[in-house]
């Protein structure tokens, strides 16, 4: 394997009433949350899948299938911890992560530092190595109409040592 590897991913979930909105392990008060088998944390899913992609290990569904009852309601930060273990065993560490959340509401800015802290703690890297941004759908499409939420992630992994 190379000394530097790049991964990218996108995660999309439908927003529905009666579900918690959890992003980067932070529960955010909102009338809707993402529909999914686990806690449906689109941010953490995208980050985890970008790491899996950088390592050429496939996608989240390969490692944490939504057909497996043990992942029902799973905390996505725990799943990210398993992905970290895979990365560590392969001799890689985080160079940096850059992620974007696309959601019409609520405002993400008050929660970004907490998200970055949670992600950097699980990935055993400096908070400065984790960038999280948010943007709105400007009332366009399924994001703008508050029917769904999206997160994109790019990561660089570096060979340890």
Regions found by a protein language model. Give the residues of each.
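C-terminal edge-of-domain segments
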Residues: 143-161
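RNase III-family endoribonuclease catalytic core
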Residues: 2-113, 123
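Glycine-rich, mobile lid/loop segments that gate access to catalytic sites or pores
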Residues: 119
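Pyridoxal 5′-phosphate
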Residues: 132-136
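Short active-site-adjacent structural elements
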Residues: 109-110, 139-143
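SAM-dependent methyltransferases
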Residues: 1-3, 160-161
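Short acidic capping loops at alpha-helix termini that bridge into adjacent secondary structure
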Residues: 126-129
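Short, low-complexity, polybasic intrinsically disordered segments
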Residues: 112-116, 146
